[in-house]
Amino acid sequence: SETMCYAKWTQVSMHLTNGKTHSCYHPPTHDIDLEELKTNPTALHNTKEKKEQRAQMLAGERPEGCSYCWRIEDVGGRSDRVYRSGEYWAQNAREEIAEAGADGDINPRYVEVNFNQACNLKCSYCSPHLSTTWEKEIKEFGAYDIVDGEHNNLDSLSKQRLLPTKLAQNENPYVTAFWKWWPELYKNLEVFRMTGGEPLMDSNTFKILDYVYKNPNAWLEMSATSNMCPPKPVLMNMFIEKLQRLEEIQIWEDPEKFNPNSGNNWYV
């Protein structure tokens, strides 16, 4: 099909800090309905907006949010829609996609989750909504004046609903819904990525590692986006200890910060 994209069914990025989701990095994120979550935790992925877009795709129409791919295809290029639909984890779910159709709920095979904004670094390419250290600096010194406006302006981020909800972690309804869904979601999961914030500063990361250890999944590819230098050495030691119990895990690190002499040659 010229309008079908398997990612709309099989892939999800969940931003549990602010209750937003999308099924690809090109479309904008949209809000997760809290009322729907109370009875259906899969609404972290299977939102009304996504179901409407799935219906459009099945009807041969082009969802507006996927305009990045449409523009590429309109000039004869091969877009990410084609690549994402051809991924092994997407192809493995073809029967489930057909069964779910536009309105049914489906468990994605590729999941990326952001549990927490907490981070001890303030990398120049990052933002206050993804780093508590960045947020603290902007609150103290204000946004950065640049040629066409202000960089990392908190008011602007707040209006875009990018800043995390001001709730304690144990009161976050999006995190609560995730853990309700997790045992069922995990069964056919093939790719799982934890981002942040800094994942090693969040208890959910270690809870995930313990669950995976107790419930082995031979098909699972798991990774974490980490700066590899949490503020407390005990966190790194605990992370290494849990990694050593798992068969394979990927650590996504900024290559510019990689120190070949650090001795940390046990990770990829």
What positions do the PLM features span?
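Accessory C-terminal segments flanking Radical SAM cores
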Residues: 1-87
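N-terminal pre-triad scaffold of radical SAM enzymes
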Residues: 6-23, 100-129, 190-193
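Membrane-proximal envelope and lipid/glycan-remodeling enzymes
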Residues: 29, 33-57, 80-83, 93-100, ...
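A Trp-anchored, charged/polar loop motif used as the substrate-binding/catalytic surface
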Residues: 47-51, 55, 91-102, 171-183, ...
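Detector for the c-type heme attachment site
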Residues: 70-74, 126-132
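Recognition helices and adjacent regulatory flanks at domain boundaries
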Residues: 76-109, 119-121, 142
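Core AdoMet radical
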Residues: 108-118, 129-173, 186-203, 215-237, ...
